[in-house]
Amino acid sequence: MIELIPAIDIIDGKCVRLSQGDYDSKKVYNENPVEVAKEMEAHGIRRLHVVDLDGAASHHVVNYNVLNRITSQTSLIVDFGGGVKSDEDLKIAFENGAQMVTGGSIAVKNPELFCHWLEVYGSEKIILGADVKDRKIAVNGWKDESACELFPFLKEYVEKGIQKVICTDISCDGMLQGPSIELYKAMLEKYTDLYLIASGGVSSMEDIRALETAGVPAVIFGKALYEGRITLKEIERMMQDY
């Protein structure tokens, strides 16, 4: 079964969504992310993807209090990303209840530090974030495109022991036009043991089933849930079917 991971993106302590990573497109869905997390848990969700968008923009973790409230008031397994750029940021994330931390920009800009984290904490706790636009890695909250090509970038980190990768196609994210299934298929063909977490573009349960059919192990979804195109009841039913 494909692992179903809803996302909570945070700006100013509120649950928001962007379109294609554009901060000007911000839409607030709920003032209280903890209530959102509790509702998800009540419908059988076990894992949550929490993104500190303020952190991503300001290059250090900002919304750790929200992370702490979610992890202390629910039993959800939380993977956390956004602004984790230093040992101190990583420590803050783990101390506030994150079970896993995603590093994206840091893996491009400071690979030595990211690899150190991988060695110290292991591939169960450190996730590689590969945010792509035209198959190039984007950094700094998706505002900048790097010269890193996706497949050489993946190869480098797979060889260093990374096992879990969240891959977001920025052109799809928040657009509700379907995920980049062909991209994910190509990644899985090349790296058969990768625990690939698809992110971006999911607009319906059909999209989730299509990813599952393509062999994608896990999916992150957000806007479709907040816009009512996917309901928590549907997610609960899908999990009960297995």
Which role does the model predict for each range below?
Residues 47-65, 105, 167-177:
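Glycine-rich, proline-tolerant flexible connector loops at the mouths of alpha/beta enzymes
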